[in-house]
């Protein structure tokens, strides 16, 4: 039984790596956004943290092998106690910000540019993300009593998943 947390700051590649690794390992995969936002609603109506914690806990109990990606995995002691290992993805701030802006443009197009209806909202998000510090995640990870695998998120995805596969399986 493996319950793997993939964490790192926004734009580090958590979702990309999580999806790819889950395909290789044949594990169930979820991202934090899957819990915060109902597929039938937009991003304007997130679920409460309590709801998210309960939904995540239920899935972790229902799936023998499970990968979850989030900036941190701080979703209560019930959830934290189920993780068997954590993967921390580090990416420099400049690369992360480029990835985030590109992702935003791919998702929202010109709406996120100056003059667009989402410009202010996206700029606020970019500022929030830009001010986050790796220490926030690292300090939280160090409070866990599980193996932590650190990986460079700027490496090619196939190299990352091969390295992670070998560490998880062996």
What name fits each language-model region?
Residues 102-110:
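Conserved AAA+ ATPase "sensor/coupling" helix adjacent to the nucleotide-binding pocket
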Residues 82-103:
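Conserved phosphate-donor/acceptor-positioning beta-strand/loop module used by diverse small-molecule
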Residues 19, 23-62:
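Conserved substrate/cofactor phosphate-moiety recognition/catalytic segment
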Residues 6:
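Hydrophobic anchor at the beta1->P-loop junction of P-loop NTPases
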Residues 12:
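ATP-binding Walker
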Residues 15:
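Walker A/P-loop
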Residues 9:
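P-loop (Walker A) phosphate-binding loop of NTP-binding proteins
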Residues 109-163:
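Small-molecule kinase domains that catalyze NTP-dependent phosphoryl transfer to phosphate-bearing small molecules
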């Amino acid at each position: 039984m493996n319950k793997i947390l993939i964490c790192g700051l926004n734009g580090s590649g958590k979702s990309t790596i999580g999806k790819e690794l889950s395909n290789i390992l044949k594990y169930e995969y979820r991202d934090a956004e899957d819990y915060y936002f109902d597929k039938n609603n937009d991003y304007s109506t997130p679920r409460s943290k309590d709801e998210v914690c309960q939904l995540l806990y239920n899935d972790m109990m229902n799936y023998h092998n499970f990968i979850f990606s989030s900036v941190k995995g701080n979703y209560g002691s019930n959830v934290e106690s189920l993780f068997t290992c954590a993967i921390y993805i580090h990416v420099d701030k400049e690369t992360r910000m480029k990835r985030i802006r590109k992702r935003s443009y791919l998702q929202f197009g010109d709406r996120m540019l100056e003059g667009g209806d989402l410009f202010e909202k996206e700029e606020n998000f970019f500022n929030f993300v830009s001010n986050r510090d790796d220490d926030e995640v690292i300090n939280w990870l160090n409070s866990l009593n599980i193996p932590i695998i650190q990986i460079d998120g700027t490496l090619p995805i196939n190299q990352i998943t091969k390295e992670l596969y070998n560490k998880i399986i062996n």
